[in-house]
Amino acid sequence: MAALLLLNRVSRSTSSISLHRVAGTLGFNSFNAQIHGDRISGTLFRVRSLATLAEGASHFNEMVSVNQRKYYLLGGKGGVGKTSCAASLAVKFASHGHPTIVVSTDPAHSLSDSFSQDLSGGVLKPVQGVDSPLLALEITPEIMKDEIKRQTGDKSVKNMMDSMGLGMFAGELGDLNLEDMLNAASPGIDEIAAISKVLQFMEAPEYSRFTRIVFDTAPTGHTLRLLSLPDFYDSSISKITKLKKKITAAASAFKLVFGKKEIQQKELPNELDQLKERMEKVRNVFRDVDTTEFVIVTIPTVMAINESSRLHASLRKENVPVHRLIVNQLLPQSESDCKFCSIRRKEQTRVLGLIQNDTELSGLKLIQSPLLDAEIRGVPALKFMGDLIWK
């Protein structure tokens, strides 16, 4: 309950390219040459498709043409390249004139590494090297926890219950160690912090000019908790409100018997109602086909495809719009006689066939992204990757 109320308060408050050569025989010579000197060449090397599933186009024109605000959430199994895909999309949006915010909700942040810039600290920071406004944020749960403590000050459980009109019962709850419970980090603090930022972006006037907001989400489990959190809070708030009414009625009866002072109804019900309305706004945004899209990122392995299929089923159950599937780290065709490479390409082709036959994934627009010969770090490299994926 404390987390619910504090979310309502906290969310209102303001808030060089490193290259790594791999598999030199695969014919990846062009990447280093094209991004050398922080410059992207106009001629990108071409990666042939490994299967005839789709052209591999992301239909970026439809993603960039609308001026109203759009939310894009990129997620999937850990280690598939979600951050690089999200960062490259944010750079692409900004390069096309859309003021953009990119947010990492993953507790193990790598957005700073992707942009080759320090984005830590839990505050929005401008990304260097992009013409249009591009701000980035790594959500830091520890900072939010400190903010919660700052806003609550040194209030004890007794004071908190007094504000609810239930101070007379505080002594009876001493054995529950509520003080320790409130001081401990919530298991869902990452998701609470992310939701609070979504609320800020939706409500604060200073964010109104940003027309694209990209989320680099945590691995699958965290992301599903994030998307289901508004429903969970909505249900919890309803239960808390009913419970308080029952306790207040019982306390009033206690007063009549023992002649205690009248219990005052404080601000809790109104604050809960306000939070309930705001949670409903977030829930509606996550499910709005006109403003939101979840992009699944995966790699061409059976395990990753299976998890992506389950993720899509869960997103469909939550009514979250999904239109695109990125298959990352595909080996391009090569004239090399590398036996290992040939075997891997054949296996990747087989896995792409599994997508075509998967009832959850076959209807999505397939985006094929190649395995590159370098780490994607810094804006020039992200522009290069963005031109390969988002076209």
UniProtKB/Swiss-Prot annotation:
The keyword Transit peptide applies. It is found in: Mitochondrion matrix. It comes from the Eukaryota. ATP binds at residues 77-84, 328. The keyword Hydrolase applies. The active site is at residue 106. Its main location: mitochondrion. It is an enzyme of class 3 (hydrolase). CDD domains: ArsA. It catalyses: ATP + H2O = ADP + phosphate + H(+). Keywords: ATP-binding, Hydrolase, Mitochondrion, Nucleotide-binding, Transit peptide. Disruption phenotype: No visible phenotype under normal growth conditions. Its EC number is 3.6.-.-. GO terms for molecular function: ATP binding; ATP hydrolysis activity. Residues 1-50 form a transit peptide. GO terms for cellular component: mitochondrial matrix; mitochondrion; plastid. Belongs to the arsA ATPase family. NCBIfam families: GET3_arsA_TRC40. This is ATPase GET3C. It comes from Arabidopsis thaliana (Mouse-ear cress). The gene is GET3C.
